[in-house]
From Swiss-Prot:
Assembly information from the UniProt record: Part of the 30S ribosomal subunit. Forms a tight heterodimer with protein bS6.
Keyword rRNA-binding set for record: yes
Keywords of the record: Ribonucleoprotein, Ribosomal protein, RNA-binding, rRNA-binding
Function summary: Binds as a heterodimer with protein bS6 to the central domain of the 16S rRNA, where it helps stabilize the platform of the 30S subunit.
UniProt xrefs under InterPro entries: Ribosomal_bS18 (IPR001648), Ribosomal_bS18_sf (IPR036870)
One biological process term in Gene Ontology: translation
One Gene Ontology molecular-function label: small ribosomal subunit rRNA binding
Upper taxonomic lineage: Bacteria, Pseudomonadati, Pseudomonadota, Gammaproteobacteria, Candidatus Pseudothioglobaceae
Protein origin, superkingdom: Bacteria
One Gene Ontology cellular component: cytosolic small ribosomal subunit
Protein name: Small ribosomal subunit protein bS18
SUPFAM superfamilies: Ribosomal protein S18
Amino acid sequence: MAKQVKRKRRPQIKINTFCRFTAAGITRIDYKDVDTLLKNINESGKITPSRMTGTSAKFQRQLTTAIKRARFLALIPYTDKHKK
């Protein structure tokens, strides 16, 4: 009978441990605030997950909706190939 190989889990890396929006006292994230939205998108254009940024679930949902609206209105690019 063959031996079972134990796989090692990759350690999770958490960069921030606090929500930036809660600390700043922000109540809503607006799609027109392009600078804030661009800080939460990586270089390939993907939305950065909350486990990397430390954003709370409430603000992560608002952030995702705002980024999608801003993309639709062409305020921010969908991918890195669409430069302004």
